[in-house]
Amino acid sequence: MKKLLMMALLAVGMTANAEGTNDFTNVNETNGVTITDDNGDKDKGSKTDIVLKEGECGNWTMHVGIGVNLVTGAPDAYEFAPFKSWDIQFTVVSYDYTPKGASQTYSIGLGLNWRNYGLKDNGTSLVKANNLVGLAPFPANAGSRYSSVQTLGINIPLLFTQKVSKSVSLSVGPIVNFNAWGWVNRDYELGDDDYSISTRKIGQRPVTVDVMGIVDIDGFGIFCKYSPMKVFKKDRGPEFNSVTLGLYF
């Protein structure tokens, strides 16, 4: 009788212990993965929730943007041609920081930016005279005529990126440009001779700021960049702005 009583008490104790165990929430966290086992009264069945928490991520990346410059606000005499005006942006290095568990990324980069604003072939070219960039005619009977304003400098893109889905992200932010070099070109043929004349120290603005937006789909991007600041300093050349449309990788 005593043995039966002891066996009954033992069985009751084991049952109570099992029920107590079912009300216990077990949390294991390994390598950024949290696994929660919950078998309490809220759910009569067995339930396992797996929550993936990405750790803080910092990546070093490189980017290239190639686009067409669309000039706006230029004086009527300056007829810039879109497909003679190009923009190449090479971000040599960019640090991209994603906070823990976030879908936003903050980036700062360092790179080079070359811009070219080419005129239509209407018989005039860009020249520098008396410390001012203006227009002058090409020599008579000149062929293969081309003239442009070009700048080259160091830029610092500061971008905020929002991941919209697994494959799509949107980026926006300012780009600070340090325009170290600038020149105007006149290229033409005359008889059997080819001429290429470059004039430097044209009075470009040393620092400008652009605003850029990017739509990226699986690493293939389309960007739009607006340049609200003038290319030349005041009274050093024609005043104009530009919008750039292109591809970004």
How does the language model describe each region?
Residues M1-F24, T161, F249:
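Bacterial Sec-dependent N-terminal signal peptides
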Residues N39, D43-E54, V92-P99, Q162-K166, ...:
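Outer-membrane beta-barrel proteins
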Residues E56-V64, A102-I108, Q150, K166-L170, ...:
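Outer-envelope beta-barrel architecture signal
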Residues V64-V68, I88-D96, L110-W114, I154-Q162, ...:
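Residues on the lipid-exposed face of transmembrane beta-strands in outer-membrane beta-barrel proteins
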Residues V71-F83, Y117-Q150, N179-M212:
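Extracellular/periplasm-exposed beta-strand and loop segments of Gram-negative cell-envelope proteins
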Residues A16-M62:
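Sec-dependent signal peptide cleavage junction
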Residues V71, I197-F249:
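Predominantly the C-terminal beta-signal and adjacent terminal strand-loop region
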